[in-house]
Amino acid sequence: MKLQKLIIENIASIEKACIDFEHGPLGEDSIFLICGPTGAGKSTLLDAVCLALYNTTPRLKQAANERYLDENDSFSGTGEVSIDASRMLMRRDSVSAQVELWFTDAAGDALRAVWSVARARNKAGGKIQKVVWTLSLQDGTPLTNKSTETRTEIERRIGLTFEQFCRTTLLAQGEFTKFLK
């Protein structure tokens, strides 16, 4: 798998960003370092890649049993939202969030994974809607329509589950000691 382009809108601390892995400085080298001060958005970049590919992130998995009260939540029926719900990465006071990842799979097919979520009626106080997560060819031809299909198809095309991807591709914050063991 090779990343080509990452487009982020309203994910955690990032309002808008487009990272081109094929042109400019990132296109010239096969390896690069993500660095910056605390809070600069380094982990958010990795979260965005994981959201597009797997509809979850390492830091959400770490908070699997934590919940908070959100009177605008429409899914649980209790107003409680799990901290591990991927839609919780929507930037505060935004009405929608999206990640678009352009990449080539193990077979060399050019693909585009899109993860998005929005609030009802495009209002900041609107209820958070269901995540929409799709996979298509880069020419726009859809390959999946449902989240379960998207997960299965991405895992098949990349050849890695979320856990395998995390172990082989990135090291989440707080996981370095575990990695050394």
Go through each PLM region and give its residues.
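Extreme N-terminal "head/tail" segments of very large remodeling/mechanoenzyme assemblies
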Residues: 1-170, 174-177
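Cytochrome P450
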Residues: 179-181
